[in-house]
């Protein structure tokens, strides 16, 4: 519920989270779930005894945080309904993080460093995951048309360009928001791809249009198309 004595701000506080979830998986899942509302500055989740089952998500805009609080209240996250409110203050979130806050400028430099490293690794490989090739050491844009994109509409979606650490729960949190969702299918031997089944092709089309290009990580916009049948 919205807490009357805490003014709306860009940071939200989440509790009643399943404590068995590993820290990095939890942060990825929260990023995946809440980035639909707007750009995120940070996701903080700690596994210290006092802070288990809690997390903080920081948006760039207060309106995004407000939408998240309203729409995700009691959302079943890893089998437990989330309790969400505005964080007491941004400084409170930083304090709770026990010094883990990274200033925006420093964080941007770190992201640039990671991106340079990723490109360097790609230049040493003849191809990228999911079959995408490289051109002059740079990845091919993920939305280039392929035969998969021209499949006739049906109730099963083919998802690729996923981070290799993506799991079925992370995808379910996204796709079950749309009517007719049935199941997620992933192939262990082929990380980075998944199949999502809906009851009919109208419902699968709605989900595809809504989630096309959704970024599970800043470097991985999802590519969604109809599956071959």
UniProtKB/Swiss-Prot annotation:
Residues 104-150 are annotated as: Disordered. Residues 104-122 have a biased composition (Basic and acidic residues). GO terms for molecular function: RNA binding. Residues 123-137 have a biased composition (Polar residues). InterPro entries: Nucleotide-bd_a/b_plait_sf, RBD_domain_sf, RRM_dom. Belongs to the RRM U1 A/B'' family. This is U2 small nuclear ribonucleoprotein B'' 2. It comes from Arabidopsis thaliana. The lineage of its organism: Eukaryota, Viridiplantae, Streptophyta, Embryophyta, Tracheophyta.
């Amino acid at each position: 519920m919205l807490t009357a004595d805490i003014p709306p701000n860009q940071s939200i506080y989440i509790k009643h989270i399943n404590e068995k979830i590993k820290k990095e998986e939890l942060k990825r899942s929260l990023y995946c779930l809440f980035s639909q509302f707007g750009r995120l500055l940070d996701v903080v989740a700690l596994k210290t005894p006092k802070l288990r089952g809690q997390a903080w998500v920081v948006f760039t805009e207060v309106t995004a945080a407000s939408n998240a609080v309203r729409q995700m209240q009691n959302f079943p996250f890893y089998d437990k309904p989330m309790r969400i409110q505005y964080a007491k203050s941004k400084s409170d979130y930083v304090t709770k993080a026990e010094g883990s806050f990274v200033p925006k400028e420093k964080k941007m430099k770190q992201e640039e460093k990671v991106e340079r490293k990723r490109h360097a690794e790609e230049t040493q490989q003849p191809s990228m995951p999911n079959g995408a090739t490289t051109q002059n050491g740079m990845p091919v844009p993920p939305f280039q048309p392929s035969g998969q994109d021209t499949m006739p509409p049906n109730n099963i979606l083919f998802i690729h360009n996923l981070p290799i650490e993506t799991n079925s729960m992370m995808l379910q949190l996204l796709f079950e928001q749309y009517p007719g969702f049935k199941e997620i299918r992933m192939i262990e031997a082929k990380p980075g791809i998944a199949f999502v089944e809906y009851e009919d092709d109208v419902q699968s089309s709605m989900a595809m249009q809504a989630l096309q290009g959704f970024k599970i990580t800043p470097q991985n916009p999802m590519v969604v198309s109809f599956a071959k049948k």
